[in-house]
Amino acid sequence: MSVPPFTIRPAAPRLDGPTGPVAVAPGVHWVGALDPGLRNFDVILKTANGTTYNAYAVRGSEGVAVIDTVKAEFAGDFFARLEAVARYDEIRLIVLNHLEPDHTGAVPELLRRAPQAQVRLSPRGLPMLRALLKDDFERYDIKGVTTGQSVSLGDRICSFFTTPFVHWPDTQCTWLAAERVLFTCDLFGSHYCDGRLFNDLVGDFRFSFEYYFDRIMRPFRSFVAQVLDLIEPLDFGIIAPAHGPILRSHPRDYLTHTRRLISSWLAAETGSEKTLLIFYVSAYRATAQLAQAIHDGAAESPDVRVSLFDLEGGEITPFLDLIEEADGIALGTPTINGDAVRTIWEMLAALVDIETRGKLGAAFGSYGWSGEAVRLVETRLQGLKMRLPEPGLRVKLHPSAAELEEGRAFGRRLADHLTGRARPREVDFAEIAAR
């Protein structure tokens, strides 16, 4: 009997997983690996419940397809399970939905054992695979595929959907219509290791599912929304991700739940009122005075909502939702020992977890001797793909009345850029470096 998503079953996951392959659908087997001891993934998120590296073998009347592999340390588990369902000379197709190392760790050895196999992946994944295989790349039948292309296994066909930036540029999905299985790689995944493998058997993994989405997919939510539109017409009965439980019970509910996770963020982006957030750290109140002046100038625009935040002694994480929903941010920092202050760098580091591409960015601050902080912050904002329409504003020591007026004018110009009243302009690296 099927159950809704996240129905609470025994709280503790089972870490003693299957020793062999596991049937997912007729002719489809899980041949992945369990990693219950993992506690930190890609540096950016904690994994209290470990993770799984899900790989799949699909048997057709004319050969076998292998869809994704596992992290290199678990290649032995992968090959043992694969050998239980297929001979290497039967492997006709290797599909790489994503080239991150936790999905391609066994690829070089798999190709050595099955050199006759076709390798199919997205065109954007080709340079990554070339880097992985080095000189061996030319030895194999490797081609990029896009939406609408497919490879036949006889009575089963693997069809491909290009799904870029979910969450790397190379990501794609693979559709097995005969068994209604959609292989989504990282999409719909979760770092949750339970040897029972299926969502209707494992413990309650709601937190892991939502936390994974927040830390991995959230910066790419607009791309995820497009992919949901692309795959929604498919009559899938199973979603087979590359991490976490296989979603065989009510799989479409996970698509709906993912839409809910992103709907509020996308709705915030469509509002007519623009938002500007100003964050600052100040040693002797000089940068604080400049921040207030910028705030006052920007707030003169009736179409811009401006908020001012002193970061001293506060936590960065609570601001991330606000920043993601905002249209622009301005960061203020004094220059201390030739650099921006640590709190500002911590905020800049945290911004990699959210979508910042295309947002307005600006920097300002006071200094005593060298004044590099503003330039360094601007460079990082550009690295985050934000647009900088105005050169950063710096004042030496405490701002004068004239410099405070310059700050208000700076704020007015930022507001004009947000509302489209100013001519589009973007500061480039050469202009930053020259200051």
UniProtKB/Swiss-Prot annotation:
Outcome reported for the amino acid change (mutating W265R): In strain: ATCC 33303 / B10
Q: Where is the Flavodoxin-like domain?
A: 276-415
Q: Does the keyword NAD apply?
A: no
Q: Needs which cofactor?
A: FMN; Fe cation
Q: What is its EC number?
A: 1.-.-.-
Q: Which Pfam families match?
A: Flavodoxin_1, ODP
Chain sites annotated for binding Fe cation 1: H98, E100, H167, D186
PANTHER family the record matches = ANAEROBIC NITRIC OXIDE REDUCTASE FLAVORUBREDOXIN
Family as reported in the entry's similarity comment: In the N-terminal section; belongs to the zinc metallo-hydrolase group 3 family.
Q: What is the protein's given name?
A: Type A flavoprotein fprA
Q: Which organism is it from?
A: Rhodobacter capsulatus (Rhodopseudomonas capsulata)
Source organism phylogeny: Bacteria, Pseudomonadati, Pseudomonadota, Alphaproteobacteria, Rhodobacterales
- UniProt lists the gene as fprA
